[in-house]
Amino acid sequence: MTHSTGTLYIISAPSGAGKSSLVKALTDTNPDIRVSISHTTRAMRPGEVDGVNYHFVTREEFVKMGEHGDFLERAEVFGNFYGTSQSRLQQTLDEGHDLILEIDWQGAEQVRKLMPQARSIFILPPSLQALHQRLTNRGQDSDEIIDGRMREAVSEMSHYVEYDYLIINDDFAHALDDLKAIFRANQLQQKRQQVRFGKLLAELLG
């Protein structure tokens, strides 16, 4: 049994929709699925680890990487820069691993132009009230910042129509099942199975 090239999955959601929790739950039970680690200039949050959650860099370092053409995509969100290393991403796909890219709609738009074969998933909260409550429960941001994130969320959610799949994160377990189903269905595509089970297929067909 051999491996095929992995699939790139773009996953986007407004802040507070539960994207990071869903992705972590998915990869905890599916070690072959990898998550692209972006570079960012934003401050590290409590519990985050450099090189695990993000590669935390200074604005000067980020600009220098951009000048060298290191980024597949980059965007500015709430005054902070985010970017994805193209070489690291391609290496992971070539090794046969499915790879998740957690980026906003602006970054997704850039990636689709360069990698049109990528699959895209948008995650929505069940309501604006639920989204506001989740942001408040984090206990990390001021009311002013939360209000800004809510305004940004409404704008970002309008871009769901640009994505292949839509998940409503009302019940976490159900949303996780939906996410797993997307990955599983793609792994069973005929072209990927043909590569994975080439020897078996040759034997079956004589």
Curated annotation (Swiss-Prot):
Pfam families: Guanylate_kin. The keyword ATP-binding applies. Its EC number is 2.7.4.8. InterPro entries: GK/Ca_channel_bsu, Guanylate_kin-like_dom, Guanylate_kinase, Guanylate_kinase_CS, P-loop_NTPase. It catalyses: GMP + ATP = GDP + ADP. Residues 6-184 form the Guanylate kinase-like domain. SMART domains: GuKc. This is Guanylate kinase. It is an enzyme of class 2 (transferase). GO terms for cellular component: cytosol. It comes from Pseudomonas fluorescens (strain Pf0-1). SUPFAM superfamilies: P-loop containing nucleoside triphosphate hydrolases. Keywords: ATP-binding, Cytoplasm, Kinase, Nucleotide-binding, Transferase. Belongs to the guanylate kinase family. ATP binds at A13, P14, S15, G16, A17, G18, K19, S20. PROSITE patterns: GUANYLATE_KINASE_1, GUANYLATE_KINASE_2.
